[in-house]
UniProtKB/Swiss-Prot annotation:
The lineage of its organism: Bacteria, Pseudomonadati, Campylobacterota, Epsilonproteobacteria, Campylobacterales. PANTHER family: ANTITERMINATION NUSB DOMAIN-CONTAINING PROTEIN (PTHR11078:SF3), N UTILIZATION SUBSTANCE PROTEIN B-RELATED (PTHR11078). GO terms for biological process: DNA-templated transcription termination; transcription antitermination. Keywords: RNA-binding, Transcription, Transcription antitermination, Transcription regulation. The gene is nusB. Belongs to the NusB family. Involved in transcription antitermination. Required for transcription of ribosomal RNA (rRNA) genes. Binds specifically to the boxA antiterminator sequence of the ribosomal RNA (rrn) operons. Gene3D superfamilies: NusB-like. Pfam families: NusB. This is Transcription antitermination protein NusB. GO terms for molecular function: RNA binding.
Length: 132
């Protein structure tokens, strides 16, 4: 059974593929099968992924307000996907903020460049503070 961390890795893969494939969802089952995401974890993955897509404009507008020199669209695909996942979980789920931040940092360490964990932590931390 996949862990929640592996589920979040899969969501990042789905968001990345979504952008590269001109927003065509034919890749969803292929990615989930490849990563062995099944049953409850598949439902959790799809809920996160679809929730992000359903709220994408709101998420991006919110993130843009915390990006000093950039717009969300100017960031790399991986960093953008991690920020969107983190923002979605902070804004639309009951996942504790400490877990969201920790997962986002770990994903950035694994998947993005060396400066990304600190950057992602700063943006999501600012979002948490503004939400209070």
């Amino acid at each position: 059974m996949a862990t929640r961390h592996q589920v979040r890795q899969s969501v990042i893969s789905l968001l990345y593929a979504f952008e590269l494939n001109s927003q065509n969802n034919v890749f969803v089952d292929e990615i989930l099968d490849e990563k062995k995401i099944r049953n409850e974890q598949k439902n959790f993955t799809l809920n996160l992924y679809n929730g992000i897509l359903d709220n994408l404009n709101n998420i991006d507008e919110t993130l843009n307000s915390f990006l000093n020199d950039n717009q969300i669209t100017a960031l790399g695909h991986v960093e953008r996907a991690i920020l969107r996942l983190g923002a979605y979980e902070l804004l639309f789920t009951d996942t504790p903020s400490a877990i969201v931040i920790n997962e986002a940092i770990e994903l950035a360490k694994e998947l993005a460049n060396d400066n990304s964990p600190k950057f992602i932590n700063g943006v999501l931390d600012a979002l948490i503070k503004a939400k209070k």
